[in-house]
């Protein structure tokens, strides 16, 4: 049976990149500004069989995915699992930590979402084939209204948070699915810049 686990890695404190992007978006979005923005590295591990405990133990000690002095790592195995992104979100009014609904923008370098060195190491440690993919997740909450609308494909927020020339981007409204990174061909729904998943 195929198993997929997501690892989301975010800053424990204020993420300066998210804070800067949040204030840039406040200028771009005019009357509908975001209230909070968070960013996390996304890693997806896929394998066959029972290796979950060994994988988590290796990742915690490897220091390749998260720096324990700076980062918070959250494991997910289904869409119902928390992402913990809102707890680390930069707030427009200053500070960190948000609550309530939001929307996600998931980005990945087109043609380069694999992580071959990390994947080879995971295969050696687990003693089985492992598929490893990487991307980035942004979580945005609106000051008022619909966060998903702020992240609309082709909108100012999507263009600021993802480079349309080199990254695929998809908006996710609702729960973040597991798995999320896939083999969509260029131009498929959810695989091209500005794609969407609900």
Explain the meaning of each model-derived region.
Residues 1-198:
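Core nucleic-acid recognition elements
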């Amino acid at each position: 049976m195929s198993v997929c686990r997501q690892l989301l890695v975010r800053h424990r404190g204020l993420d300066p990149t998210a804070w800067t992007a949040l204030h840039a978006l406040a200028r771009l979005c005019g009357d509908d500004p975001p209230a909070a923005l968070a960013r996390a590295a996304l890693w997806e591990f896929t394998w066959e069989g029972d290796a979950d405990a060994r994988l988590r133990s290796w990742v915690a000690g490897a220091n390749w995915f998260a720096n324990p002095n700076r980062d918070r790592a959250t494991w997910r195995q289904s869409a119902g699992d928390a992402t913990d992104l809102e707890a680390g979100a930069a707030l427009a009014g200053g500070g960190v930590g948000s609550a309530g609904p939001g929307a996600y923008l998931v980005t990945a370098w087109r043609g380069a979402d694999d992580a071959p060195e990390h994947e080879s190491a995971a295969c050696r440690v687990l003693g089985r084939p492992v598929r490893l993919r990487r991307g980035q997740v942004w979580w945005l909450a609106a000051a008022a209204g619909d966060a998903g609308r702020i992240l609309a494909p082709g909108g100012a927020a999507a263009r600021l948070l993802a480079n349309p020339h080199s990254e695929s981007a998809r908006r996710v409204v609702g729960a973040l699915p597991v798995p999320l990174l896939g083999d969509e061909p260029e131009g498929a729904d959810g695989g091209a810049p500005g794609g969407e998943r609900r």
